[in-house]
Amino acid sequence: MRLPSILVVAASTLFLHYGYTSASPGADAVLTGAVSLGFLQLVGADQSVIEQPRFLRDGKIAEGDNEERVNAQKEAAAKVLDQVFKTKSLSPLDKLEKTSNLAVIRHVAAMVDDKVDKIFAFADAVGMGRASMLKMLKGDKQFTDAERLKTVKRYVKFLIKKEQNNKA
């Protein structure tokens, strides 16, 4: 709550308190609450906005933990991944080889896993089995045999995981 709204509540409560018909213990409680909120607002007025997440986590912050930095890392990872899918090339990933920021690489890996799971879910929805997946990948010359097998193994793991989730 902001201080001006607290002051308005306190002033209106004081106004009601002095009326003959509306004076009640409830008005006293509202006045006490408004004044205490106003006092807390004034006491905490020197606290900066940056300290709010720290307050919510009880002051327990890991070294180097910064919310803005995490958001920037996620945005950088999303940008690289979008470039990969728009250009249909892995050349934007070359930027990641040069970076020493492990968090960005982890975010990219997590986003790639999510994207691949969505693609596998679509393939499963249209009834594609692992043999069909392998046949489709053999038709594409930009994959090596090792990449084809790795993709099919990952697809099989996805199908097994999906079956286990359906049984549970």
From Swiss-Prot:
Q: Where is this motif: RxLR-dEER?
A: 54-69
**Entry GO CC:** extracellular region; host cell
Q: Which residue spans adopt a coiled-coil conformation according to this UniProt entry?
A: none
Q: Where in the cell is it found?
A: Secreted; Host cell
Upregulation? Expression is induced during host plant infection.
Function summary: Effector that is involved in host plant infection. Contributes to virulence during the early infection stage, by inhibiting plant defense responses induced by both PAMP-triggered immunity (PTI) and effector-triggered immunity (ETI).
State the protein's name: RxLR effector protein CRE8
Origin organism lineage: Eukaryota, Sar, Stramenopiles, Oomycota, Peronosporales
List the gene name.
CRE8
